[in-house]
Amino acid sequence: MRPFLSGSGAAIPSRRTALTLMAALPLAASPVAALAQAETAPPAPDTLRLFRNLLTRMGVAVALNGGPARTFIIDTGAERSAVSRELAQTLGLPSGPDVMVHGVTAAEATPTVRVEAVEVGRRRFPGLEMPVFPRQALGADGLLGLDLLSRFRLVLDVRAGRALLARPGEGVSVGEAGEIGARRQADVVVSGRRGPSGQLILTRVVVDGVKTSAFIDSGAQYSIGNLALMRAARIAPATNPDRPTRMEGIVGGAVAVQTGQARDLGIAGRALGPTPLLFADLHAFSMLNLIEEPALLLGGDLLTRFDHVILDYGRGRVAFGGLLRHA
């Protein structure tokens, strides 16, 4: 899916260009100022696509039915792994029943295909029914969701730009490519409680002094708080009421979001300082029973502030590495 702001007249032509444009925005201005840059006449709502994460965008090799390895994006916010329509057609995968897929913004009945075996590394998972989406929506041949990721220890090695999947309890190296176990700050390990689909819900997150429940969505570009958090932290909306911002996901329609800036955000005891956020009562919060209490979806904009993040689903723990220094 090519990201765009509605009314701007042009889509961002490529991932590389998108990264360049995003890097040019100062931290305090994004995403609020980025949205404000789109001029329209007459005024029309901005549309912010929840496209596959341009910042983390880490994938792993996955083989279906013994075929050649394909790149599947890691998405810790997706309850089910999915395959692109184009790959399903190429492999001649038979149709399965429609299933209800719960996305960030909505739930939607979605077609599936039957897969005899999914191979991830040396592990083989037989007999899966996988939802099907257009490749441009996924941004890859498929994605790995929590139904499979929860069987692993997942390392998002931001500094080295790679993702690692290990068996629970298996050791992994974190650091620059070719650099074994290099760490500049000790990891901070926090425990999480289990969500309905295996998500790890963390509590060591504080937004402007407000204790906040949070979960990691590695497939989301932006971090999004619910309206209960916005009220509790007394964050003033920055969105122009004449130009409402709307957000679209792969599943379901658009939802209205507000923009604002937290004065101080802390994750696992690490202070991130002033941080721009989006706010909406997303379907994802409802699914996790987090509508009434302050809650935050941790997206790529915050995950990439850390050297690495390790999700150990077997032990119910998340480890955050040191903060990266951004120029």
Enumerate the language-model features and the residues they cover.
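Pepsin/retropepsin-fold aspartyl endopeptidases
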Residues: 2-12, 17-327
